[in-house]
Amino acid sequence: TPSHMSELLNVAHRLGATSLRTYTRHIGTVEEMMQKTVFDLSVVTGEACDLDVIIVLENHEDFTGSELLDIVERVDHPNLKILYDYGNSQMVLEDPIESLKVVLPYVYSVHFKDHVMIRADDAGQLTVAGVPIGEGFLPLTELTRCLLEQGLRRFTFENVWSYSAPIQEGRKALNGVNLGHGAFAYLDPPFDPARLVLRHSAHSPETLVDLEMCALN
């Protein structure tokens, strides 16, 4: 909400932070979510400017690159930029490279991570799952090269072991997406829990901590 964003903008300012990352929490149709997000951001971008903080809107499992671009251009404020996450476009069945091409001029910072796809038969529904960097199917080299050539240096390395998210309901595969191939290649079972975990309840908390340390090492 704008009031929550205002509070966090002031926290960021007091900490000396130059940016504040956010993503939409709205529900509804895609257009409804976009309209509400535009409204919220339009309320707080002026305050962000006064505090010298850049708001970065993440492609957080909800919007395609063109939808995210549309939001930023509707708000039309220099203190609103985009946080590009390497894999989150997969949840809306958009190729990560195609998504980056669309939003690149507005990208301010980056989440660097790796993903695999899990078949519906193996996960209950078509699912994106996080794995240690380098063990997934995202085009890490090509994405990184494109971002570096654009001058981006704000990279955050994300540990997404045991993270998973379903494909958003109602989304259809966009141009360049071929399920089972490329960035959308399926990982075949059995699944090594040191690589990914789909069902946390199958392990004790102590085992999960040990497995995560194994994944990180």
Where are these regions (language model features)?
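Active-site flanking residues adjacent to catalytic metal/cofactor-binding acidic residues
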Residues: 57, 84-85, 113, 157
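Active-site acidic/histidine proton-transfer and metal-coordination neighborhood
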Residues: 1-82
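Short, basic, helix/turn surface patches
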Residues: 21, 43-54, 84-88, 137-141, ...
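Histidine-acidic metal/acid-base catalytic patches
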Residues: 65-79, 90-217
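Short, flexible loop segments at the rims of nucleotide/cofactor-binding pockets, characterized by
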Residues: 33, 58, 87-89, 132-134
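Short, acidic/turn-prone active-site loops that include or flank metal/cofactor-
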Residues: 25-27, 84-88, 114
